[in-house]
Regions:
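Phosphate-handling active-site elements
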Residues: 57-61, 244-257
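Cationic, low-complexity basic patches in intrinsically disordered or flexible, solvent-exposed regions
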Residues: 9
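Conserved N-terminal subdomain of the carbohydrate kinase-like
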Residues: 29-34, 48-130, 134-137, 283-290
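Short, small-residue alpha-helix embedded
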Residues: 47, 227-251
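Short pre-catalytic strand/loop immediately N-terminal to key active-site residues, enriched for Gly-Thr
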Residues: 36-41, 220-231
């Protein structure tokens, strides 16, 4: 009996040692949070954010704001309650010291207000990247003017916004952007209006992305993939920037690395159902390890 009790004690001590070791490891890894929606089809949203975080060597955490579901021949966004979003954020704040935050689809004005309060509490604590999801390629719908105006209140609280050309057009109240020249114009117009660092992406039509911070404009050129597996590219781009910034890469390094990462994810994309989703096999995650690049 004494031997049995001794064995039990040894097992308990081993479990405690493993638990303590795991807790210590969790404290050491970089922790990045995505605040956004769930894409039931798996191509965008928090699903792609978490895959990107893992591929680029950060530990992903989530605050869910909404769920995309099929509705007839289209899709619908089902928002979570404001209280549930608040409770998730409180859980994160209580238990984790974050190294970066990526914000995606917020779904309602009320949820935007909750996220504004969160960003005010943590402005300057860690990089905050905002992908302002204002237009959906699948339906060409535009979100309400009230939502767009509320999002503009969020912009000064983040470190970078990553609109695609269509979202930049909506934010700047501009004409449709179909050429690089028009993209340059809308980027300058938007930067003059909202005074925040931004990288405007070509959105599958233009291979060049444009950075502007009010003082400087910089072009990030690259090849244009002919693959149709680009669903989730915008989500992956912003979460990749978040991961790289969390690893202390400079902003321009982070943008450049993330652009290359997303191109590979499109090239390696997969067809799932009727969707062509970005995909980045986990075996390629070494492209985000800082020590191998410097």
């Amino acid at each position: 009996m004494d031997g049995f009790k001794t064995s039990q004690l040894a097992v308990l001590l081993l479990k405690e040692a493993l638990y303590t070791s795991q807790k210590g490891l969790l404290k050491m890894v970089l922790k990045t949070l995505t605040i956004g929606g769930s894409d039931t089809w798996g191509g965008g949203g928090i699903q792609t954010d978490l895959r990107t975080f893992e591929n680029l060597n950060t530990f992903g955490l989530t605050v869910l704001t909404c769920i995309a579901v099929e509705e007839g021949d289209n899709f619908a966004i089902r928002a979570l309650s404001v209280e549930l979003v608040k409770e998730q954020l409180q859980t994160i704040e209580k238990n984790f010291q974050l190294d970066g935050v990526k914000i995606g689809l917020l779904a309602t004005v009320e949820i935007v207000e909750v996220v504004i309060d969160f960003c005010r509490r943590h402005q300057g604590d860690f990089p905050i990247i905002l992908d302002p999801v204002l237009a959906f390629k699948e339906t060409q719908e535009q979100l309400a003017a009230e939502y767009i105006e509320k999002m503009k209140t969020l912009f000064p609280l983040v470190d970078l916004i990553t609109p695609n050309r269509n979202e930049a057009q909506l934010l700047a109240n501009s004409e449709p952007v179909e050429t690089l020249e028009a993209m340059v114009d809308v980027t300058k117009k938007l930067a003059d209006q909202i005074k925040v660092k931004m990288i405007v992406t070509g959105g599958g039509l233009i291979a060049t992305d444009l950075y502007r911070d009010g003082m400087e404009t910089r072009a990030f050129a690259g090849p244009l993939s002919e693959k149709k597996t680009n669903h989730g590219a915008g989500c992956s781009f912003s979460s990749a920037i978040c991961s790289h910034l969390a690893q202390d890469f400079s902003l321009f390094e982070s943008i450049d690395k993330s652009k290359k990462y997303v191109f590979e994810a499109i090239e390696n994309g997969v067809i799932v159902g009727d969707a062509g989703n970005v995909w980045h096999p986990i075996t390629q995650k070494s492209c985000g390890i800082k020590s191998s690049d410097k």
